């Protein structure tokens, strides 16, 4: 998947508002939104996997690879993904984001040349406060400037662990979603990780490289569009973005 969220806009406002929405989030409904902040920043690491073969061609094309029907899956073109995020450090005005965890599950669809993706469910760890959720949503609108056909939010308990040779994350103990990656044993030219450098990650201006780690499993078990894949694309990446990296919005035209 070309990140989770290739152009992730067409409309930053739509994505930001959706990610900060309260669908299925009773606790967020009564929360006051943090004031708009001119200064914000996020440095986050993602455990990411999708249904595409290794390495996901969505980073170089306007559509995902074709999939023959197998293991109970229908054929066609799609990129079904799970992205598990952990914020290393960040803020949105006075709202601190260090340590916040959240998850994205969905499908980019078969053609995203216009910046329109199929569907996504964003799940926040229960420890993330309403103010943090709203702040994350606004920042992620710049990270992934796209429009979604369907956008929902949820809440769950998230585990996130990155080691030397493996990385894994679970939602609700794996009942809702799970991802497990492993470092390839035969692809490296020598000791160390296999890393793709100088490749842009969505709307972010800086990243540490795509650390390639095929998945052992990437699955989403909730809702009406569950999926599960094994042995397909996976990687870890750390991105960095600040408010200074995003150009100011164009002024509204006088009517």
List the model feature ranges, each with a label:
Residues 1-4:
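Positively charged n-region of N-terminal signal peptides that target proteins for export
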Residues 19-39:
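Cleaved targeting-peptide boundary
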Residues 37-255:
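Beta-strand-enriched cores of mature, soluble protein domains
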């Amino acid at each position: 998947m070309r990140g989770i969220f290739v152009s992730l806009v067409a409309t930053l406002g739509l994505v930001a508002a959706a990610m900060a929405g309260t669908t299925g989030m009773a606790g967020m409904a009564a929360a006051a939104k943090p004031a708009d902040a001119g200064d914000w920043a996020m440095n986050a690491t993602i455990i990411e996997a999708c249904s595409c073969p290794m390495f996901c061609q969505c980073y170089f094309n306007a559509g995902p690879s074709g999939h023959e029907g197998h293991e109970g899956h229908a054929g066609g073109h799609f990129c079904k993904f799970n992205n598990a995020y952990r914020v290393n450090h960040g803020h949105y005005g006075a709202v601190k984001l260090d340590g916040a965890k959240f998850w994205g599950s969905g499908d980019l669809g078969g053609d995203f040349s216009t910046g329109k993706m199929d569907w996504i469910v964003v799940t926040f760890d229960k420890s993330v406060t309403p103010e943090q959720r709203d702040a994350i949503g606004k920042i992620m609108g710049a990270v992934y400037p796209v429009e979604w056909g369907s956008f929902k939010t949820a809440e769950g308990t998230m585990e996130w662990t990155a080691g030397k040779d493996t990385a894994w994350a679970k939602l609700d103990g794996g009942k809702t979603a799970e991802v497990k990656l492993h470092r390839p044993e035969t692809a490296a030219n020598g000791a160390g990780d296999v890393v793709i450098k100088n490749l842009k990650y969505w709307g972010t201006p800086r990243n540490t490289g795509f650390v390639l780690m095929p998945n052992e499993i990437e699955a989403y078990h909730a809702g009406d569009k569950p999926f599960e894949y094994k042995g397909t694309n996976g990687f870890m990446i750390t991105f960095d973005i600040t408010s200074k990296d995003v150009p100011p919005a164009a002024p509204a035209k006088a009517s």
